[in-house]
Swiss-Prot record:
It catalyses: (indol-3-yl)butanoate + UDP-alpha-D-glucose = 4-(indol-3-yl)butanoyl-beta-D-glucose + UDP. It holds the Pfam family UDPGT. The gene is UGT74E2. UDP-alpha-D-glucose binds at T131, Q334, H349, W352, N353, S354, E357, D373, Q374. This is UDP-glycosyltransferase 74E2. Expressed in roots, cotyledons and leaf hydathodes. It is an enzyme of class 2 (transferase). Plants overexpressing UGT74E2 develop more compact rosette structure with shorter petioles, dark-green leaves and a shoot branching phenotype after inflorescence emergence. Mature plants are shorter than wild-type. Over-expression of UGT74E2 increases plant tolerance to osmotic stress. Coiled coil: none annotated.
Length: 453
């Protein structure tokens, strides 16, 4: 490999973006590339090496002073992040050149398209990384091109559009930023602007795999130089070729982990409902009470991740009342939980990272989406990949306890449950094949690496 096989990687400063891009770095490092992972932080520290010696983490400031609230104004936040990155990169690139390892490209998050011009200004290639699936990006693309009119509300149920290789969609299946544009005008602009200069990028990377979006892939490849490199799940849960890649980089050795795993070890195979809604979804108190009642009345064992800031919404004396039927924790080792034989289904918000984890580990899912791309992911989870069901919400989005119970029984029992489990196992195998030697994503990663060797 030639000198200078060195890339700068710049994720958007959010865990759902940092995780897949840092996992991609591990795959690239295993192929011989050197990576500098630039992380925007409110408390930047000196650069440091990861477990893999070829990856250097380079924290930089988000542009806010101590005591300032960074997310009070999204436009202000994005502007300061952009300024901080543009002020930092010249010296970083120059230092790399002086060290004898000049960068060849910048791999940047799709929500920061201005980095393409920054890369080209330094004579570097620009590779955009989409942390969302093509099924979502395609919708944003049609909005960007003006070929799709944004509906005024998400609560309509008439068919609105059919995009290339898509099932028919209703407003309730679209990303929330489209149907509630007046509530999220700044975010809508950001997600649509992901496509603003995609026709000029050198390579387009996506955290998905070919078989998962096979029909849609033909369409996007006719437009752009696309390489699917997912799923970006740690290797030891998939192909097992990278023995050190066991987690996303967080310590798993604490009392809460032991509590989770010991509790699961005491349960029969496929008997536990696992619930987690990610790090951002906030349930209203009435929805939390209804969900708690549905779980209790289902009679099923359940492991529920409830953030410490949300526990006050649980019913009074709930933990005592459920006894051994349920375990409520503030955090869980999600990959270990999903891989555990006792898990019968995953009740999820259908964020893309969680959806990919469920698919990769062969776990049937119950989708309870809230915002962003979650409704679209849930639509495909149920109707295209057929690995679960989506709860039926009322007009205002509220989900009744009876619907929670019905969905759990549908996935855990009966003929439909068996078919769902069979499909989940199929996608698990296909995900493993994609990242294994000679698989579609492995070939894509090799092709990407060869551009800089």
């Amino acid at each position: 490999m030639r000198e200078g096989s060195h890339l700068i990687v710049l994720p958007f400063p959010g865990q759902g973006h940092i995780t897949p891009m840092s996992q991609f770095c591990k795959r690239l490092a295993s192929k011989g590339l050197k990576l500098t992972l630039v992380l925007v932080s409110d408390k930047p520290s000196p650069p440091y090496k990861t477990e893999h010696d070829s990856i250097t983490v380079f924290p930089i400031s988000n542009g806010f002073q101590e005591g300032e609230e960074p997310l009070q104004d999204l436009d202000d936040y994005m502007e300061r992040v952009e300024t901080s990155i543009k002020n930092t990169l010249p010296k970083l690139v120059e230092d790399m050149k002086l060290s004898g390892n000049p960068p060849r490209a910048i791999v940047y998050d799709s929500t920061m398209p201005w980095l393409l011009d920054v890369a080209h200004s330094y004579g570097l290639s620009g590779a955009v990384f989409f942390t969302q699936p093509w099924l979502v990006t395609a919708i944003y693309y049609h909005v960007f091109k003006g070929s799709f009119s944004v509906p005024s509300t998400k609560y309509g149920h008439s068919t609105l559009a059919s995009f290339p290789s898509f099932p028919m969609l209703t407003a309730n299946d679209l990303p929330s930023f489209l149907c509630e544009s007046s509530s999220y005008p700044n975010i809508l602009r950001i997600v649509v602007d992901q496509l603003s200069n995609i026709d000029r990028v050198d390579i387009v990377l996506c955290n998905t795999f070919d078989k998962l979006e096979e029909k849609l892939l033909k369409w996007v490849q006719s437009l752009w130089p696309v390489l699917n490199i997912g799923p970006t799940v740690p290797s030891m849960y998939l192909d097992k070729r990278l023995s050190e890649d066991k987690n996303y980089g967080f310590s798993l050795f604490n009392a809460k982990v032991a509590e989770c795993m010991e509790w699961l070890n005491s349960k029969e195979p496929n008997s536990v409902v696992y619930l987690s809604f990610g790090s951002l979804v906030i349930l209203k108190e009435d929805q939390m009470l209804e969900l708690a009642a549905g779980l209790k009345q289902s009679g099923r064992f359940f492991l529920w991740v409830v953030r410490e800031t949300e526990t006050h919404k649980l019913p009074r004396n709930y933990v005592e009342e459920i006894g051994e039927k349920g375990l409520i924790v503030s955090w869980s080792p999600q990959l270990d939980v999903l891989a555990h034989k006792s898990i019968g289904c995953f009740l999820t918000h259908c964020g893309w990272n969680s959806t990919l984890e469920g698919l990769s580990l062969g776990v049937p899912m119950i989708g309870m989406p809230h915002w962003t791309d979650q409704p679209t992911n849930a639509k495909f989870m149920q109707d295209v990949w057929k690995v679960g069901v989506r709860v039926k919400a009322e007009g205002d989005g509220f989900v009744r306890r009876e619907e929670i119970m019905r969905s759990v029984e549908e996935v855990m029992e009966g003929e439909k449950g068996k078919e769902i489990r069979k499909n989940a196992e199929k996608w698990k195998v296909l995900a493993q094949e994609a990242v294994s030697e000679g698989g579609s994503s492995d070939k894509s990663i090799n092709e990407f690496v060869s551009m800089f060797c």
